[in-house]
Regions:
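Core beta-strand elements of the Rossmann-like FAD/NAD(P) dinucleotide-binding domain
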Residues: 33-44
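Short beta-strand to alpha-helix junction loop
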Residues: 1-5
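C-terminal, flexible cofactor-proximal segment of oxidoreductases
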Residues: 86-87, 98-216
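Short, solvent-exposed loop/turn motifs
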Residues: 39-41, 67, 171
Length: 216
C-alpha cells in the first residue's frame, strides 16, 4: 500500500471493520444490510466492484429512475457491458446527483500514474463537498451541455493516434463501428495527465458554476 496511515486507520474510534463472508445484500435508505442481518447506517457509500471496469453488475439509480447503465449504454442484451460512456471528466454523471466516480470512464489516459490521479480526484471531490457544505448546497450534478462537451473532447483526444486504427478495449466503439458510421464513443481521455488536470482543477473548459448544477 502507498498510504502509511492505512492500517492505523482501523484503530480510530470512528472506524469499524465489518467482516461478513457473504457481504452486503441490500442497500437501505440509511445505509447497508449485511447477509448476517446486521444493518449499518452510513453517510457515504463507496462502490468497489472489482476490476471488470466495463461491467455494471447492479443498478445505480439516480433522478427520475435514470440509471448509470442507461447513461453508459449498458443493458441486458450486451450483458451489462458499458458501450457509450457519457460524463464530465469521468467523475460526474448527469441525473446522478452527489455521485462521484474515481478513475472512471473518460478520465484517464491508459498510461497515467493511477495513484496520482486518485489523489487529485480525491482532493477535487473533498473540496467540492466542502464548498457545498459551506454554501448550504445539498445536490450537485453536471449540466447536460457540460457532459456533451467533455464527451466530444474525449472523442477528439484520440484523433491522430493509434487507438483509432484498430479494435481495442479503450475505444468503446470499434474501428468497424466508426467505419460504418455508427456513434463513436471514447472510453478514455487520450491527452496528457497535465491537460486533464487543467480541466478538472484549472477551469480549462469552464469553471464549476458553468459546468455543474447546484441545488439547495
Amino acid at each position: 500500500l502507498f498510504i502509511d496511515e492505512y492500517y492505523t486507520t482501523f484503530n480510530k474510534p470512528n472506524v469499524r471493520l465489518v467482516n461478513d463472508p457473504n457481504g452486503v445484500v441490500n442497500i437501505t435508505e440509511s445505509g447497508v444490510e449485511m447477509a448476517s442481518g446486521d444493518r449499518h447506517d452510513v453517510d457515504v457509500l463507496i462502490y468497489a466492484t472489482g476490476f471488470d471496469s466495463n461491467h455494471i453488475p447492479f443498478p445505480v439509480t439516480g433522478r427520475d429512475g435514470v440509471t448509470l447503465a442507461d447513461q453508459y449504454g449498458a443493458n441486458e442484451a450486451n450483458n451489462w457491458q458499458m458501450t457509450r460512456p457519457q460524463s464530465l471528466w469521468g467523475m460526474h454523471v448527469e441525473n446522478l446527483p452527489n455521485f462521484y466516480l474515481m478513475i472512471g470512464p473518460q478520465s484517464l489516459n491508459p498510461v497515467t500514474n493511477v495513484t496520482l490521479l486518485c489523489e487529485e480526484q480525491g482532493k477535487y471531490i473533498a473540496n467540492l463537498v466542502a464548498r457545498m457544505r459551506q454554501e448550504g448546497v445539498h445536490e450537485v450534478e453536471p449540466k447536460a451541455e457540460a457532459v456533451a462537451d467533455w464527451t466530444a473532447r474525449c472523442n477528439a483526444s484520440a484523433d491522430g493516434k493509434v487507438w483509432l486504427r484498430c479494435n481495442n478495449w479503450y475505444m468503446k466503439s470499434t474501428k468497424s463501428d466508426v467505419e460504418a458510421g455508427r456513434e463513436r464513443s471514447q472510453g478514455m481521455w487520450m491527452e496528457t495527465y497535465e491537460t486533464y488536470l487543467q480541466h478538472v482543477l484549472g477551469g480549462a473548459g469552464g469553471d464549476q458554476d458553468t459546468l455543474l448544477r447546484f441545488r439547495a
